[in-house]
From Swiss-Prot:
Main localization category: periplasm
Entry annotated with the keyword Translocase: no
Keyword Signal belongs to the record: yes
Residue spans crossing the bilayer: none
Organism (species): Rhizobium leguminosarum bv. phaseoli
Subcellular location: Periplasm
Signal peptide (residue range): 1-25
UniProt keyword terms in alphabetical order: Nodulation, Periplasm, Plasmid, Signal
Protein name: Nodulation protein NolE
Highest taxon above the source species: Bacteria
Region of interest (Disordered), ranges: 27-64
Annotated GO CC locations: periplasmic space
Biased composition (Basic and acidic residues): 48-57
């Protein structure tokens, strides 16, 4: 009976995985080039794009130290303060846009 239950659970998990589609890990990142090539700002209207460009010359914030915080003003909600964020490792910057990773870490810690 236990063996049958095991197969039922495995089959259900497999069915859920197949219905969910591609893995979250299978994104459009090029492992050799660094951050994802897709630009989340593509869906912004003109005013939002201008506001975002005002705070960051480089969308991925590769050249701006995390301590300065200018890169994150358009991403973080007003109630979140930059002082509470973790410093991001250089290794992380090779694969992820810095501000996206920072936002994910802040949500996890607060």
């Amino acid at each position: 009976m236990k063996v049958t239950g095991y197969y039922v659970i495995v089959a259900a998990l497999l069915a859920l995985a197949l219905r969910a589609g591609p893995s979250l890990a299978a994104d459009d990142r090029n492992q050799d080039c660094g951050p994802a090539t897709s630009d989340p700002r593509a869906n912004l209207n003109g005013a939002d794009k201008a506001h975002s460009a005002e705070h960051t010359q480089d969308f991925n914030c590769q050249d701006t130290p995390a301590e300065e915080g200018e890169c994150y003003e358009c991403v973080l909600p007003p109630e979140v303060r930059i002082e509470g964020a973790e410093v991001i490792d250089v290794a992380d910057r090779n694969f992820y846009p810095r501000k996206t990773l920072l936002l994910a870490r802040m949500i996890r810690h607060h």
